[in-house]
Amino acid sequence: HRFKSNIGKSYQKIAGKSLIEINVIKARKFKQIKKIIIVYNKKDAKRVKSLKLKHVQLVMGGKNRQQSTYNALKCLTNKKSISKVLIHDSARPNFSLKLFHSIIKNMKSARAVVPKIKIQDAVKQIIDSSKEEYILGKKRDNLFLTQTPQAFKLKEIYQLHKSNSAK
């Protein structure tokens, strides 16, 4: 862990609540959220269950983020009442309720909504990794950092993850 703790970032506490709990509390403020799924690492099974989250489905993650997301999406495919999905990194609880509302609102007419931040830092690309002196400065005009939560049409994101998991 980057911040020198044996406890995963999602389980760190702020004002007595884990980052997972903070995210769940925020999500529950929106009536459009019909189901909350927490994907956890196998080694964190006891820790996530100790949170005693009510009305939350726990799903064991996979060997990488893509597989973990796919495991969660599989739980939703038989739910006829769910056509859209929000995917969020539980280690990032500082999204605003205004952003959350905007994502939900924009999903009424979009296939996907992915919040982005313009890159301010200098961006470089190594052209030949065997000779690191060949570094090319990149224009930032078309480069962005993406954030979560991200929203997608369930069928489309499920199919993408399904096809990627087969590779």
Positions of the model-derived regions?
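N-terminal glycine-rich phosphate-binding loop and ensuing alpha1 helix
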Residues: 1-45
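Residue-level signal for inorganic ion chemistry
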Residues: 20, 72, 89, 118, ...
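Residues at the starts of beta-strands that form the adenosine-phosphate
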Residues: 34-36, 84, 111-112
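Generic enzyme active-site microenvironment
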Residues: 39, 87, 116
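Short phosphate-binding loop-to-helix
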Residues: 51-83
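Short beta-strand-to-loop acidic/aromatic patch adjacent to the donor-nucleotide binding site
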Residues: 80-92
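Conserved core of the sugar-phosphate nucleotidyltransferase
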Residues: 94-167
